[in-house]
Structures are given as structure tokens and as C-alpha cells.
Curated annotation (Swiss-Prot):
Alphabetized NCBIfam families for the sequence: PRK00099.1-1
Domain of life of the native organism: Bacteria
UniProt entry tagged with the keyword Ribosomal protein: yes
Cysteine pairings via disulfide bonds: none
Family: Belongs to the universal ribosomal protein uL10 family.
Protein name, as recorded: Large ribosomal subunit protein uL10
Assembly mode: Part of the ribosomal stalk of the 50S ribosomal subunit. The N-terminus interacts with L11 and the large rRNA to form the base of the stalk. The C-terminus forms an elongated spine to which L12 dimers bind in a sequential fashion forming a multimeric L10(L12)X complex.
This protein's record includes keyword Zinc-finger: no
Cited function: Forms part of the ribosomal stalk, playing a central role in the interaction of the ribosome with GTP-bound translation factors.
Organism of this sequence: Chloroherpeton thalassium (strain ATCC 35110 / GB-78)
Keywords associated with the record: Ribonucleoprotein, Ribosomal protein, RNA-binding, rRNA-binding
Coiled coil: none
GO molecular function per UniProt: large ribosomal subunit rRNA binding; structural constituent of ribosome
UniProt cross-references to CDD domains, sorted A to Z: Ribosomal_L10
Amino acid sequence: MNREEKSEIIQSVAEKLSKAQGVYLTEFSGLTVSEISDLRKQFREKDIEYKVVKNTLIKKALAHTKISDKLADGLKNTTAVAFGYDDPIAPAKIIKKYSDGNEKLKFKMASVDGTIFEAGQLDQLSNMLSKTENIGRIAGTINNVISGVPGTVNAVMRNLVSALEQIAKQKAA
């Protein structure tokens, strides 16, 4: 690979790193071609890009981004990067599920919305709610509040009418 090709790769990886909300470093040594293909398929289904890139090129690309240099600590051995653009948690869920069934895939580090997560924190990451799940929860909460408002207003009106009727009866008596 000549200097120009390396420069293009560095620029491309830097763009991906900047666009991604979640960047995950994995070690894949020992995985067969079919296992890597299966893993890539799972990532593609969630619109996650999974690329094998040389550590030195990733390190140089990181220098062109706002991602913490601490992520470079995970650049040892073979490295593949998962770029989560829309949902920063989705890659963690896939990596966790896949590595539970195949110990050859190892989670190294991640940067999720600027926060660095280390190897031992994959469970914590994978248990977080995804963006879609959070939106669903918020929408459900808002819906519950909105649907409760008419009942509350009706109860207040009913109590007011009842109180006015009692006052009218007392004055009539």
C-alpha cells in the first residue's frame, strides 16, 4: 500500500469516526471467514459499518477527530471497527450477543457520544436502551400523561359542580 492509498484510508476512517455516534474496537483473530461474514451481516441489518483497518491508520485517523486519544489504547493485535451512526448502542448489543456465542470475538474499547468504555464495560453498554427504545419510552410516558389529562379535568369539573350544587341546596334551605 503506497502513501497515497494510506492517506485516503486515513481520511475515510477519520470521516467515519467523526460521523459515528458509537465507535467500537474489536479483536477478531481466530474467527473464520464465514463467522466474520455472519457478524458483518448482523451489523449491516442494523446499519452499522464493520471494517478491518490497520492500527497505525486508525491511530492517525483519530488525530483528525474529537474522539479521545484514549481510544488508541485499544489498538493492539488485529482490530476491526464498528461504526454506529444512528444508534450508538446497537453495536454493543450485537458484539455482546455474538461474543457470548463465540469467544473468539473480543470487545476492546468503545467511544459512545464522547465517553470511553473499556473492555470490562461491554455488559453495561449492551444493557443501555437504544435510541429507538428511549424514544418509545418517552412517547409512552407522554401519551400516558396526555391521556390522563381529560380524566383529571373531568374529575375537577364534577367536583366543582357537586360543590356548587351543595352550596345551592344550603342557600335554598
